[in-house]
A protein has these predicted regions:
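Conserved Class I S-adenosyl-L-methionine-dependent methyltransferase catalytic core
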Residues: 11, 18-39, 44-50, 58-59, ...
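Alpha-helical subdomain
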Residues: 2-82, 177-178, 182-353
Length: 353
């Protein structure tokens, strides 16, 4: 290092803007510390109370000295607490790294620390040359990579299910799904949102359409909830066809996975299946005009850019996208969710019938 140069750690000692920027630069540590903790099951090892680093290491199969250093890093981010006797304990943040607890983010930590992490290295190339960051790094599309790697596919799906679980109640409470007898959940994943809708609206029947592996998980979830009599899970390709004749077609966090051309193809497929008077319901984050007015939507937009070359959209962009597929945007219902989701309700334009 040349004279006069400083490392981020040196800058952190200075204070002020240098310190704050140094913390941002060092944030790469946080992602990987959380990933290691999630991967090893550190939070679950602390579920019964505080333990020493050595005790945790024995429980999760790790090197005691190295793991203890990782645990201290997590203390700095308030994920763990370090007690006077040197034992470590879960904080409210750390509790959300446990597997299967309400509000769990373990799946997100696993996904961010693996595929998202590696794909981000391709962002500069995507910005300067075009294309998708993920494909620059891995040489194939994101979903193709997942399909070839069952372990990472499981981690990603766990992340999606955790997220859907956190958001479903807000969506149902905000929109209510009134006047709908039959609903098709297009790309409904593991069925978390359809489960919540069916529980809240006893008069409604639902059909979930997705890939075979998702359908299997959804069928198991809805069956365990006793909702199999009011639901059906079918394999399908939403670029080709969806079940016709329903009162409403729901696409939750689907359209943001695709660029405008592919998104329009999906919407056109739905339009072809919709009878007169049917509703199209999109559950999506709406990008605000100014970043600080919707930080979660802005962050998700960057995830979509890096992984898929796709995007979150402003309300005006949604309106244009829907119009291009033969829909009128009728209303936007904010859900109040932490992710800033809204339900966009649209109907087929008279000219498109």
């Amino acid at each position: 290092m040349q004279a006069g140069q400083t490392t981020p750690s040196d800058a952190a000692e200075v204070g002020g803007p240098e310190r704050d920027l140094a913390r941002l630069i060092d944030s790469y540590l946080t992602t990987q510390l959380l990933y290691v903790a999630a991967r090893l099951g550190v939070a679950d090892a602390l579920a019964d109370g505080p333990r020493t680093g050595r005790e945790i290491a024995t429980s999760v199969g790790a090197d005691p000295d190295v793991l203890t250093r990782v645990l201290r890093g997590l203390v700095l981010d308030d994920v763990l607490a370090e007690e006077d006797d040197g034992r470590f304990a879960l904080t409210a943040l750390g509790e959300r790294l446990r597997d299967g607890v309400p509000g769990s983010l373990r799946g997100a930590a696993l996904a961010r620390g693996e595929l998202y992490w590696s794909a981000a290295a391709g962002l500069l190339q995507a910005v300067t040359e075009g294309g998708t960051a993920f494909e620059h790094v891995h040489g194939e599309p994101f979903f193709a990579r997942l399909a070839a790697d069952p372990e990472r596919e499981a981690a990603f799906q766990a992340s999606m299910a955790d997220r859907a679980q956190r958001e479903a109640a807000d969506v149902v409470a905000a929109y209510g799904f009134p006047g709908i007898g039959d609903l098709v959940d297009v790309g409904g994943g593991s069925g978390v949102l359809l489960d919540a809708i069916l529980r809240a609206t006893p008069e409604l029947r639902g059909v979930l359409v997705d890939r075979p592996e998702a359908v299997e998980r959804a069928r198991a979830r809805l069956g365990a909830a006793g909702l199999d009599g009011r639901s059906e899970c079918v394999e399908g390709d939403f670029f080709a066809t969806v079940p016709p004749g329903a009162d409403a077609y729901l696409l939750s966090r689907v359209i943001h996975d695709w660029d405008d051309a592919d998104a329009r193809r999906i919407l056109t497929t739905c339009r072809a299946a919709m009878p007169a008077g049917a509703r199209l319901l999109l559950v999506e984050a709406i990008v605000p005009e100014r970043a600080h007015d919707g930080p979660e939507a802005v962050r998700m937009d960057l995830h979509m850019l890096i992984l898929l070359g796709a995007r979150e959209r402003t309300e005006a962009q949604f309106r244009d996208l829907l119009a291009g597929a033969g829909f009128d945007l009728r209303r936007v219902v904010p859900t109040g969710s932490a992710a800033g989701l809204s339900v966009l309700e649209a109907t087929v334009t008279s000219a498109a019938r």
